[in-house]
Regions:
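Short hydrophobic segments within beta-strands
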Residues: 56, 68-69, 134, 167, ...
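N-terminal cap/lid segment of alpha/beta-hydrolase-fold proteins
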Residues: 5-60
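The feature captures the conserved acid-bearing segment of alpha/beta-hydrolase catalytic domains
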Residues: 163-177, 189-225
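Primarily recognizes the serine-hydrolase "nucleophile elbow" in alpha/beta-hydrolase
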Residues: 118-182, 192
Length: 227
């Protein structure tokens, strides 16, 4: 039952409360950090109201650019829930960009990958140095997909990518074809294969790490082990 295998919230006590807690923590950090760092919110990279990213800049010249792509099964959330996750990198001198994107079912997963590539390119034009990609869940899929064959990420940007971190990422989308959420994702067999990094050759040379919680559900442990 793949619908159950990918249903996280119902297996976490009080799981429904977490998004509100994330948003509260993110807003609190932005308020506290505004005196230490430069915070540029909702920088547009495309025509849609969701085509924007938040950019957090350290004092002085950044050491490089860290990208964090949020999860939510391509169907929910936005960068405003995750601002506090920028603290570690920006405190160490890196710029951090968190892209937003149009959600399914308004677009398809392949469209989201293209949008995030555009957001990364936009931020990369503003910040010099190495690029470090990271993403959680669906975001983990996106960042690993962008570093595989057929990626929409421009070669000039791809060549700057030094590392990729996928946190509880989904690297083989074919099981999602058998889930109830696919009524919203609208994946077909061809797109599921084309957006599965595990089925594609890597693009360029970069350091790759996949992480999942030791107590996560078995399907997420399996997905992390695939790469």
């Amino acid at each position: 039952d793949f619908t159950d295998a990918y249903a996280n919230t119902k297996y976490i006590a009080g799981g429904d409360r977490y998004p509100a807690l994330w948003a509260e923590r993110a807003a609190s950090w932005r308020e506290k950090a505004s005196g230490r760092f430069i915070i540029l919110r909702k920088r547009a990279y495309g025509p849609h109201e969701r085509n924007h990213y938040d950019l957090f800049l350290p004092e002085g010249t950044p050491r490089g650019l860290v990208i964090f792509v949020h999860g939510g099964y391509w169907m929910s959330l936005d960068p405003s829930f995750w601002s506090h996750l920028a603290e570690g990198a920006v405190s160490r001198g890196y710029a951090v960009a968190m892209p937003g994107y149009v959600l399914c079912p308004e677009v398809r997963i392949s469209d989201i990958s293209r949008q995030v590539a555009e957001a990364i390119s936009h931020a990369a034009a503003l910040v010099e140095g190495p690029i470090h990609l990271s993403g959680h869940s669906a975001g983990g899929n996106i960042v690993t997909r962008l570093m595989a064959a057929g990626s929409p990420l421009p070669e000039t940007v791809q060549e700057r990518v030094a590392s990729v971190l996928s946190i509880s990422g989904l690297h083989d989308l074919r099981p999602l074809l058998a889930t109830q959420m696919n009524a919203t994702l609208r994946l077909d067999a061809a797109e599921a294969a084309a957006q599965s990094p595990v089925l594609l050759a890597p693009r360029g040379r970069f350091m790759l790490a996949t992480w999942a919680g030791g107590a996560e559900r078995s399907e997420f442990l399996r997905q992390s082990a695939l790469l």
